[in-house]
UniProtKB/Swiss-Prot annotation:
PANTHER family associated with the record: MULTIDRUG RESISTANCE PROTEIN MDTB (PTHR32063:SF21), PTHR32063
Membrane topology (UniProt): Multi-pass membrane protein
NCBIfam families registered for this protein in UniProt: PRK10503.1 (NF007798), RND_permease_2 (NF033617)
Protein name (record): Multidrug resistance protein MdtB
Compartments in which it is found: Cell inner membrane
Record field: transmembrane: 16-36, 342-362, 373-393, 396-416, 440-460, 472-492, 537-557, 863-883, 888-908, 911-931, 968-988, 1002-1022
Location of the region described as Disordered in the Swiss-Prot/TrEMBL record: 1032-1052
Quaternary state and interactors: Part of a tripartite efflux system composed of MdtA, MdtB and MdtC. MdtB forms a heteromultimer with MdtC.
GO cellular component, one term: plasma membrane
Keywords: Cell inner membrane, Cell membrane, Membrane, Transmembrane, Transmembrane helix, Transport
Amino acid sequence: MQVMPPTPGGGPSRLFILRPVATTLFMIAILLAGIIGYRALPVSALPEVDYPTIQVVTLYPGASPDVVTSSITAPLERQFGQMSGLKQMASQSSGGASVITLQFQLTLPLDVAEQEVQAAINAATNLLPSDLPYPPIYNKVNPADPPILTLAVTATAIPMTQVEDMVETRIAQKISQVTGVGLVTLSGGQRPAVRVKLNAPAVAALGLDSETIRTAISNANVNSAKGSLDGPTRSVTLSANDQMKSAEEYRDLIIAYQNGAPIRLQDVATIEQGAENNKLAAWANTQSAIVLNIQRQPGVNVIATADSIREMLPELIKSLPKSVDVKVLTDRTSTIRASVNDVQFELLLAIALVVMVIYLFLRNAAATIIPSIAVPLSLVGTFAAMYFLGFSINNLTLMALTIATGFVVDDAIVVIENISRYIEKGEKPLDAALKGAGEIGFTIISLTFSLIAVLIPLLFMEDIVGRLFREFAVTLAVAILISAVVSLTLTPMMCARMLSYESLRKQNRLSRASEKFFDWVIAHYAVALKKVLNHPWLTLSVAFSTLVLTVILYLLIPKGFFPLQDNGLIQGTLEAPQSVSFSNMAERQQQVAAIILKDPAVESLTSFVGVDGTNATLNNGRLQINLKPLSERDDRIPQIITRLQESVSGVPGIKLYLQPVQDLTIDTQLSRTQYQFTLQATSLEELSTWVPKLVNELQQKAPFQDVTSDWQDQGLVAFVNVDRDSASRLGITMAAIDNALYNAFGQRLISTIYTQSNQYRVVLEHDVQATPGLAAFNDIRLTGIDGKGVPLSSIATIEERFGPLSINHLNQFPSATVSFNLAQGYSLGEAVAAVTLAEKEIQLPADITTRFQGSTLAFQAALGSTLWLIIAAIVAMYIVLGVLYESFIHPITILSTLPTAGVGALLALMLTGNELDVIAIIGIILLIGIVKKNAIMMIDFALAAERDQGMTPYDAIYQACLLRFRPILMTTLAALFGALPLMLSTGVGAELRQPLGVCMVGGLIVSQVLTLFTTPVIYLLFDKLARNTRGKNRHRDEDIDSSELLNGQEPQ
């Protein structure tokens, strides 16, 4: 089987060698295009891999979780469930709020999803409660995605209700208009309102009820059209004093007459300017504040969005009074920028190390400059392709370019080394360039396309992992392709004009010492190689052992999804007993905040309590902890989290759950801990039985810590058991009872005050401080059929029960989410296996289905495709090599080098305590492409020696190994030193980059040592096998010819 001979006279390089001006201008064009592309590229932490996600929030103050579920969530879910492209629908119905999160397929544009959601909301409108104060509101945002910016607004001389009003109208609305902003939430809930607190005994004494008062207030405050008068000469618009806008006006409102005397609202109630919801509060550190959390839309440029907000912020702050202070407490872009800057530094360091390696081997300044120019040209030129493909400058693309520094010089090194060999033999530089480039051209093409073939399977991966791989793979492939073009055009042209026999023979002390060292190494390698070739079966057993060891290590190594990053930001959830009151929860929250702020690694924090669209239950408080920069603290996030939890453990009755904020957010729900899986059943009763059992079982298992669930069914419920017969006899309907209860205890929004810039509400409630607890029910009065007051206690009894604080659905069925963190020293793979085992041990019924969520689900998908991905890469490379060599055998020889790389990578990961995760898998895929280069360079020269010089296979492969030892060692060290900065990185985001560097360095070291010996032995083995096969075929053909002659036939 013959390899295609090199094109005589320079091959594809001939035109570029003979036309230096055109070649130079061509390279300048590539460089300029890359510079322009670089300046236009956006910057982000990772490639945009967000699922199109929309959150629908519906507020219904005073409604229980049961009422919210049945009257709001269920009708909306039925409509949403009919949308095409919907991947998952999760809902959480709590007291006063319904939150539905819709996650769509990656291929569905977000704008199309938005249109479908709006249509579904419109279709469900007639099924929603008629007294719903606000329609369902949707936002193009993932609720689990942490805010890109957090602003804290505090004031000393102005009430927080006024501060909230100014922030909402002057800041929040303007920020919402910025391109890329998905949602601006105001935590703290101090929206201005007129609060009417009824004095229940006074209302009863005057023979009134709350419904009469509610109706009077609603009728007294209206803002409707009144028409206009159109006379002969002029037109007059009608207006009236039909609105009441302040608490003072409401105090004098006449709500009824008794014995001809007016009863004013202030006679039966306390009226004050207050907050619309007085069970919401937020703090910046320990100071009361309005906290603005700004979240991005899925798929937008974080840096550009944050920069736009920061540019407009000074002007917005100027519109506020001087006593109002606005601070940026969290800016996620600071760590993104720091991480990208660190990778850029590592890229420059990798370039410097690679150039140093080239100089040590070539020992000549001119010869070093030529391949060194290939690095900036290839890398900068790649930016142009990245721009046209819609990529960004992020950790993965910069990692690809860093790794590419070791790749892109390989081709140039091979070319210059071959040309230098002919110049040193005495040939003219131009002839040497034409001859050397023509001879090596096919090898360059083989190296390039076989390496790109490794990356092809990455392009066809689906889901989140596929999106992550794709940008990395394409960036690397483009850099490799440009480097091949440079090596076949610019490199030989420069060799013809910059190299000479004298310059190559000119040596200094360093070059002479390195020359002696390399000669010594090659001499010893030659001796060792002869011994190995004379004992092939021992070498083959070593090669087979590496294959077996690779499989064993793959099975044993801990497996994860994505490295845990230290971005300097921690999300926390504080959990208190399910029956805790708002004031008690706020007090506990402040206790915890004070403890956390004492930690030396903590810079600031924001926290809030209360039920809104982001927090489901009153017994949960949310915290966002900002850490000091890495340079100002000694510990990483895992140690800080452990320390904070230990510090807070002394506060009675609370549990603190913490998790580090990550750049990659796949989850759709904001959970207490990092990993989640759900249990889904047909009824809440089944979940109430099995969720606690499973949580208890997991708490006993080693891989887990902070195991918890969102199943909370021990909230106190005051059940009003109405005697329907008695109520009917008195002419009291259930609607009247519900209205009376809602008026008393629901912070009912009964009227709207319209102004030029905003709308405010009138809130009705009983003054429960006068009669706290269940005794407040004794003050409820209803009006019977005879017009007389009827105490609620005469027709109903109050029973204390337990009930759910929230009701969760997944794809319209009741569900509960169990969440956990990993214990120190355990991997996500071990945790997944432990969950499966726990389900079997507690004998979970078949009608309760479990499913991992978020990053755990993505981990399972990635784990399932990893092996097939590696196999696909090997098959793709075999096909390309088979086509290039027109051989079935030689590609197998080349691919036999791969197990050595796998052993080195897996051993390096285990020794450094890293998991086999997505980033490490990228490293292994790249090793498959790099390591086979050694075999290609050996086999190309061996085949050429057999064909052109008539050498035996033994002599040919022996000479090829010695002749190619120097370029093999040079290219391997270039790739190794290119990966070294990633392995040794310590800055922001280093956790993301280290596994790739560790894989590359470990794999290259082991494979370099082994493939120099195993490849020639396997080459001879397959050559012998091929010759034996050809011999048998020849004997068979001769036998056929003989039989034809005996039968009197001419041979065919």
